Amino acid sequence: MSGSALSFTIFPGSILGFLQIATVLTVLLLLFKTAQFYLHRRWLLRATQQFPSPPSHWFFGHKIPKDQEFQDILTRVKNFPSACPQWLWGSNVRIQVYDPDYMKLILGRSDPKSHHSYRFLAPWIGYGLLLLNGQTWFQHRRMLTPAFHYDTLKPYVGIMADSVRIMLDKWEQIVGQDSTLEIFQHITLMTLDTIMKCAFSQEGSVQLDRKYKSYIKAVEDLNNLSFFRIRNIFHQNDIIYSLSSNGRKARSAWQLAHEHTDQVIKSRKAQLQDEEELQKVKQKRRLDFLDILLFARIENGSSLSDKDLRAEVDTFMFEGHDTTASGISWIFYALATNPEHQQGCRKEIQSLLGDGASITWDDLDKMPYTTMCIKEALRIYPPVTAVSRMLSTPVTFPDGRSLPKGITVMLSFYGLHHNPTVWPNPEVFDPYRFAPESSRHSHSFLPFSGGARNCIGKQFAMNELKVAVALTLLRFELLPDPTRIPIPIPRLVLKSKNGIYLRLKKLQ
């Protein structure tokens, strides 16, 4: 009896003591974190003191209204030459760069991708070419480069044309003589169709099979969720994010995306079990993207792990269709709003291709005016609006200003392409900026980034852009919808807040 009473009196005291200790430890942790925040912020302020910026809140940083990021960067381009700090919050700053000399210097270095900006993509696309750094990146880049040799790309032109024609046939069935259509979703299916056939040896048509729409939707969701997570201070922690509604949505989208790529890998492996197909592949002078991965041997002689294989497939599946879909959609919009240039392209294409029954690799170099218009559209609407680097060593820029190791530099291609000191009247669509006789800075136009880490598939992408523009202009006149003007917004690729609606007028 007395023993029970004794234990009863001690137990509440033990709880109280535990709570007191926990409170003290919590206060000490908060004090430590506060001191850490203060010291890191002081270091960042000193590190960026040579670069003026608009006023910011000490904790919340620069408050930018939702979907006003481009207006903000254009204001900075106008008021702060070459570069400007952007505080995401009190202890996180990045230097936005929009000057060609600055771009050339940073892209000529070997700084790694910014961990803060890119780590949130890892659960989705893994550590493939986009996220890898150092020697591993170099090995993978060298391994995959043959997939984009011109001998490999040549036969893809016909495949691209077939995919575009399927889309245009659908458009003819959907639209009347003069109807409005949201084009981005259709073009996304078409570019996914193309990449599945060219890079992943898939048969059939993505555009005619409804099951692929779930993958398209997953990519669209991850575009938004990844973008918003980077900018949310409360979602930096993986555990907290996993418990949030956005975290649950992201997990579901990751699963859908991975199911798609796993099926692609499984399907190709099954095809290669057939001895006839295997021998046909082995006799090829150049292998397709996925076959390179499946037959690859790293320098030590071992094959790629399943994890590394899927990371490269996930990376190129996304980058190989979504960026191109963005580029084509905005090119169509630019041509719709500049009818005189659209007609100039059409005349050039008609004289080259006639009715467009056939288009070949050699034709792609014979449409200079159309190429100029494509490049001008990519200048105004770059599919990838920015990339980030973490400085691995200090850097001094041509104007004498410098930054220390550890600072994140964001290369704003959108800011560069709209910089009036680089491109006079930057909002005016003028394809003659890209005429052969026009001169410009080597790093003033970077739709595919630059330096050693430029887009490995840039020639593939340019070919697809040309094929899509050529065949579409032979069958449709593109007209803007004045009631729904697209509003560009930055995501992982350039999107429109309200879709891209065009009036499609079938040509007789």
Curated annotation (Swiss-Prot):
Q: How does it sit in the membrane?
A: Multi-pass membrane protein
Required co-factor? heme
Expression across tissues: Expressed at proximal straight tubules and preglomerular arteries of the outer medulla as well in the cortex regions of kidney (at protein level).
Quote the record's binding site residues for heme: 319, 455
Q: What CDD domains has UniProt attached to this entry?
A: CYP4B-like
Q: In which pathway does it act?
A: Lipid metabolism; fatty acid metabolism
List the Pfam families: p450
Which regions span the lipid bilayer?
A: 10-30, 120-140
The protein's location, in the record's own words, is: Endoplasmic reticulum membrane; Microsome membrane
Query: Per the record, what is one GO cellular component?
Result: intracellular membrane-bounded organelle
Q: Which UniProt keywords apply?
A: Endoplasmic reticulum, Heme, Iron, Lipid metabolism, Membrane, Metal-binding, Microsome, Monooxygenase, Oxidoreductase, Phosphoprotein, Transmembrane, Transmembrane helix
Q: Which domain of life is it from?
A: Eukaryota
The biological process GO terms on file are: arachidonate metabolic process; fatty acid metabolic process; icosanoid biosynthetic process; kidney development; lauric acid metabolic process; linoleic acid metabolic process; response to testosterone
- In short, the EC number is 1.14.14.1
Query: Signal peptide: which range, if any?
Result: none
Report activity regulation. Answer: Activated by cytochrome b5 and phosphatidylserine.
Q: Name one GO molecular function term.
A: arachidonate monooxygenase activity
Q: Which PANTHER family match?
A: CYTOCHROME P450 4A11-RELATED, CYTOCHROME P450 FAMILY 4
Chain's role: A cytochrome P450 monooxygenase involved in the metabolism of fatty acids. Catalyzes predominantly the oxidation of the terminal carbon (omega-oxidation) of saturated and unsaturated fatty acids. May act as a major omega-hydroxylase for dodecanoic (lauric) acid in kidney. At preglomerular arteries, may participate in omega-hydroxylation of (5Z,8Z,11Z,14Z)-eicosatetraenoic acid (arachidonate) to 20-hydroxyeicosatetraenoic acid (20-HETE), a signaling molecule acting both as vasoconstrictive and natriuretic with overall effect on arterial blood pressure.
What is the name of the protein in this document? Cytochrome P450 4A12
Name the source organism. Answer: Rattus norvegicus (Rat)
- Gene name? Cyp4a12
